[in-house]
């Protein structure tokens, strides 16, 4: 299961989740091709918000809270065989991890092993997060290989 934030304007307009540069980066991070990524028999994609929330001063606004409270439990009830949930960004992490989340996203992502095998927290793959990625080179060096191995093992794909 991939839990993101809310669709950006491009995704909102096309109706295809992760159909933007963030999705390209997420597929690179997970080492999944588009065919596998969008295979509904292997991967479910659920955002925290289902509509484009609009733009704020530093990017898209947060997902609207009423979406998650109204739909998430109902959708998850229809997904009984979830083996791993990728928590993309702070909103998904705060919702699913609650008090188990660390003080901030960086600490939560660095502590990914604490949440396995159920969850794998990740930063949002948006190009707006390039500064975070540059400030945290350990993410690419240590976290991405672990993510790729975890995904390939669950999906029975050769890394």
Question: Locations of the language-model features?
Answer:
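Residue-level preference for alpha-helix termini and adjacent loops
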Residues: 15-17, 42, 47, 111, ...
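Glycine/proline-rich loop-helix segments at beta-alpha junctions forming the active-site rim
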Residues: 49-159
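Adenosine ribonucleotide-centric catalytic and binding domains
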Residues: 1-42
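Generic beta-strand or strand-like secondary-structure segments
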Residues: 21, 25-32, 47, 67, ...
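Conserved beta-strand scaffold positions in the cores of enzyme catalytic domains, especially
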Residues: 2, 43-45, 119-121
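Short, basic/glycine-rich phosphate-binding loops at helix/coil junctions
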Residues: 6-10, 42-57
